[in-house]
Amino acid sequence: MTNLRKTHPLMKIINHSFIDLPAPSNISAWWNFGSLLGVCLIIQILTGFFLAMHYTSDMLTAFSSVAHICQDVNYGWLVRNLHANGASMFFMCLFLHVGWGIYYGSYLYKETWNIGVILLLTEMATAFVGYVLPWGQMAFWGATVITNLLSAIPYIGTTLAEWIWSGFAVDKATLTQFFTLHFILSFIVMALAIVHLLFLHETGSNNPSGINPDSDKIPFHPYYTIKDTLGLLFLFLTLLLLALFSPDSLGDPDNFSPANPLNTPPHIKPEWYFLFAYAILRSIPNKLGGVLALLASILVLLIIPFLHTANQRSMMFRPISQTLFWILTANLITLTWIGGQPVEQPFIIIGQVASMSYFLLILVLMPLAGLFENYMLKPKW
């Protein structure tokens, strides 16, 4: 009798993707983050679904509807805390996933990488519109400042900003539009994630050594399903610790006040996972230049595959590139810290140096390091 999972049209797809999938035998825990992101996405969609049942996208009642969810809905506080902190866990896994891709040279699977960058941009848009929905003070002003940046685009900027606002300022129509976008973008993210997975399974997975693993592969189940389960346990533990013991530690205190268009907070900032890009935006004194730098900070990932100069794929055996990679990591942490600080010295100059270093490392120093490592590995006789 033939096995159902190998003959049934639907089960066959699942089988080839998660059970009998040939995987390199030496992939490390860094390869867990793909599955962790999938689980994070499912958690976000499920908790968001239950929140949407009780949320009202109206200027007058949005803030109180979130308070109602936390106070009156059965386990509403838990659902809301899981959704808010789940976003932080999602982006933490996302940044580690991108970092691992750069370190091990996974960007050389160009189609998978490019879809991944589009996915990252879509997720950032989803998180941004979602952040505005509780209609807290910082959420409102964050939405006003960030969407107002569109007006810097020549000719069409003002029209574009008013189209995003559905009026002449952030208002009731903006909130309704953002709620709709937040809802629909979640499913677009899910569709893009499936495309990302399809492209990955066309080429097969990379491995830490960066060499072709075709001669040494093992089935995904049970080896990597067990390995991924360990990562999932850590994810659930961290998320539950955050949601149950310190649910507001990653949020902004200003969001405990309802949005007030007549009172500007002394320091406007987005959520922590956007602070690195926000710091780059603020480091350019010119408005249009700042917007372009903000876009470039993410879109620069698209050209990384074309800047690969090393003969070896992975950084595992390339100490100079490794050093530059960890400098880049420290640089991003610095930018995240600077994004949360007020616009005054010495934070302005630190932000400008860190922003310049970010682009210099990716566009110049890392490709040069690859060429130098090639030269060092050449036989000298």
Swiss-Prot record:
Membrane topology: Multi-pass membrane protein
Residues reported to bind heme b b566: 97, 196
GO molecular function, one term: ubiquinol-cytochrome-c reductase activity
Cofactor(s) the record lists: heme b
Note on how the cofactor is bound: Binds 2 heme b groups non-covalently.
Protein's cellular compartments: Mitochondrion inner membrane
Keywords of this entry: Electron transport, Heme, Iron, Membrane, Metal-binding, Mitochondrion, Mitochondrion inner membrane, Respiratory chain, Transmembrane, Transmembrane helix, Transport, Ubiquinone
UniProt-listed InterPro entries: Cyt_b/b6_C, Cyt_b/b6_C_sf, Cyt_b/b6_N, Cytb/b6-like_sf, Cytochrome_b, Cytochrome_b_C_euk/bac, Cytochrome_b_N_euk/bac, Di-haem_cyt_TM
One example of a Gene Ontology biological process annotation: mitochondrial electron transport, ubiquinol to cytochrome c
Family: Belongs to the cytochrome b family.
Function: Component of the ubiquinol-cytochrome c reductase complex (complex III or cytochrome b-c1 complex) that is part of the mitochondrial respiratory chain. The b-c1 complex mediates electron transfer from ubiquinol to cytochrome c. Contributes to the generation of a proton gradient across the mitochondrial membrane that is then used for ATP synthesis.
Protein name from the UniProt record: Cytochrome b
Source organism of the structure: Antechinus swainsonii (Dusky antechinus)
